[in-house]
Amino acid sequence: MSGIQFDVSRLCAATISIQGRHFVDSHGRVLHLRGANVSAASKVPATPAPKIHDHAQASYVGRPFRLEEADEHWARLKSWGLTFVRITVTWEALEHKERGVYDEDYLAYLRALLQSMEPYGLVAYIALHQDVWSRYCGGSGAPGWTLEAAGFDLSNEGENLSLSGAAFLDGIKSGRLAGERGLWPTGYQKLAAATMNTLFWGGETFAPLLKVPGQIDGKWVSRNIQVYLQEAFLAATAKLVKAVGDLETVMGFELMNEPHPGFIGIQSIHEWDYTTDLHLGQFPSPLQSFSMGAGHPTPNVPVYTRSFPFPTRVTSHVTANPEGACAWASKECPWEKHGVWRWSEAKQEAAALQQDYFVKNRDGGKVDFYEDFYFPFVRKWEQVIGENISSTKGLKARMVEAIPNELCPEWKEESRPKNMVYAPHWYDLNTLFKKKFGFMSVNVQGLARGMFILRALYFGTAAAKANYALQIKTIVLAARLKLGPVPVIFGECGVPMDINNEEAFRTGDWKWQERSMDALISAMEGALMGFNLWTYNPANRDDIGDDWNAENFSWYSESNRTKLLKNAEKSSDGLDVGARLLNVIVRPYPIATAGNPTSLAYDANACAFTYRFRSPLRVSAAAPTPEEYTEIFLPRRVFRKESTEWTVTAGGKVHVDWERERVFVWFEDSSLTAASIKDDTRPRRIDIWVIGRKVEENWSIAQILVAVVILLLGVLVAYYAQLYEWEKDKMIFQHLREANGM
């Protein structure tokens, strides 16, 4: 193809637009966006983090990394083909000191960080990140003053929050977490986070008496806590958009990471939903958490431990908060004030007054989290984004998602933001919960929706791929059915590095992490989904992981890079040093398609890439234009000139640019006329592979025996479950007979 000039794509907000369900470039080609979350380090302040009671002093300047290091990190991500970045920003980073006082140093740092991406052709969207509402609830996100406005006591390093069971705070304190390391998600059901989420979304409905005084236009007024929190959040969003929204490296903003309804929608304050809410450790009911938070020692609080085949089971009951610590600075629980419950001095226990309080509005009608609270706020947020983008040039997408582990809800067009992108998350919940991945994988998504247990078990690597693919396609199909032609991007997906008792740290054998990651990315490819892997965190270390709640997801670590370079027999400054799983993360994919994608697959073992798409046939013998050729990323770490072959559908022309790691493909037949091939977008295919690479998966005898044993256990569980149901039916029938005098 001598003499033909092929342009390499450079992502830029000014040249990306949305057409139906696709992102497209300025040439009308369909973009496949993939990249990383940068980074988990941004969940916590720069070292050293202040004490909880000194939360106003928190600074996030230098998170995720120092500006002088940025060029190397962007170059590394580009070399891996990960050019679509989700930038983690917390509300606390923007406004930690007090309401209305923004950290200008951080905003200047963030702007410079985003500008530094431009020479590398990377593009980003900004995600306002939260987990469990705030660091001061045991997660990340909102500033400490939001909890104080609601009445929580953050004094003395948050001691009363911890002692009263209102929050699990051990995981946000720097260092290796001892004991049970999977407790942080249970924070959503603890008093602090559940209350804050309820107040943020539905304070006017569920806590109308909770007012916050403040000045507006020089006058002191009292506003409902919902209005106070939402106005502050939207003002912080406006500040963020004004600071970076004009940059061509910024192609969008995300409303909120993994929004949660808190208490809204729970059927009874006597229990949480076992099928959707992780029950682990000391796990009080909402009523028990009210009692504990109000400073009462509370008996009969269940303690859950890990089990099989159900994830957890009750193994004991304890008297929680025996010290009588109170989570409220005023010593008054707002839920007691609103008549949800009361403390009985006579019985020395909490009594429910309105057990279904959180499913009704003020008029007694049933509430719906999405329709009544979430969608109205999305519309307010959309207005703020639109009003504060100073430049109309280029795409500013609006990323939104559903409640974690829920499928896309019904979402009317009038409730959707402009340039909407649906951005769900997906993880293998069984691997996350057990910190194990091996011969057997489980479809937790299916189990939560009533799938028979034997259908939810998968054995072997190929089956794990099928498991992941089914779960991803279920999420995508639900979004397609509810939203129609709206782009879908998986904003988070990833694999823990510390699975299987941290064996890989000791042996250097990352095969199980590689298999899980390969299954994950293969599932995304099978569904033609773009994605952001969680997470690229240079601050990661083997001993403390990402230094937040014992999570360890980063496949790159500066600490490991330093060790490897120090111990290397010969000097190496390659960008790959310090990374893991690159054999499955760095893979070919279609960057820009002249036509419509129909299927994508990559076998990381065989190094075999197959891409099918519908593309027009050219009739000109002249050099193809960017509108006419498809551009594929072909990483040189896998595909070498001397060992790579390819085939292409009839009429296909291929140009490989080995230096720039690109394949350009187009289809032509100069013997035809334009009229004869009008609207001809027939299926095309290109296959690229490395000669002689093929690895077969074989089951060992031990693995076969394990599969048989598990299947037998599944049958027994099903049998006894059916016996239990029959016994229940028998008792009901007997009761009916007695009631009718039979």
Curated annotation (Swiss-Prot):
Catalytic activity, as annotated: a beta-D-glucosyl-(1<->1')-N-acylsphing-4-enine + H2O = an N-acylsphing-4-enine + D-glucose
The keyword Transmembrane appears for this protein: yes
Catalytic-site annotation from UniProt: 258 (proton donor), 492 (nucleophile)
Subcellular localization: Membrane
Gene Ontology molecular-function annotations: glucosylceramidase activity; steryl-beta-glucosidase activity
E.C. number(s) listed in UniProt: 3.2.1.45
SUPFAM superfamilies attached to this UniProt entry: (Trans)glycosidases (SSF51445)
Enzyme class, broadest EC rank: hydrolase
Transmembrane segments: 701-721
Glycosylated residues (UniProt): 37, 160, 388, 552, 560, 698
Main location as per UniProt: membrane
Record carries keyword Iron: no
Phenotype upon loss of function: Decreases membrane glucosylceramidase activity at neutral pH. Increases cellular glucosylceramide levels; levels of normal glucosylceramide containing mature ceramide and abnormal glucosylceramide containing immature ceramide are both increased. Decreases capsule size during growth in capsule-inducing conditions.
InterPro entries: GH5_C, Glyco_hydro_b, Glycoside_hydrolase_SF, Glycosphingolipid_Hydrolases
GO terms of biological process kind: ergosteryl 3-beta-D-glucoside catabolic process; glucosylceramide catabolic process; metabolic compound salvage
Topological type in the membrane: Single-pass membrane protein
Keywords noted in UniProt: Glycoprotein, Glycosidase, Hydrolase, Membrane, Transmembrane, Transmembrane helix
Activity across pH: Optimum pH is 7.
GO cellular component labels: membrane
Family indicated by similarity: Belongs to the glycosyl hydrolase 5 (cellulase A) family.
Biological function: Specifically hydrolyzes the glucosidic linkage in glucosylceramide. May prevent accumulation of aberrent glucosylceramide containing immature ceramide.
Protein's name according to its UniProt entry: Glucosylceramidase
Source organism of this protein record: Cryptococcus neoformans var. grubii serotype A (strain H99 / ATCC 208821 / CBS 10515 / FGSC 9487) (Filobasidiella neoformans var. grubii)
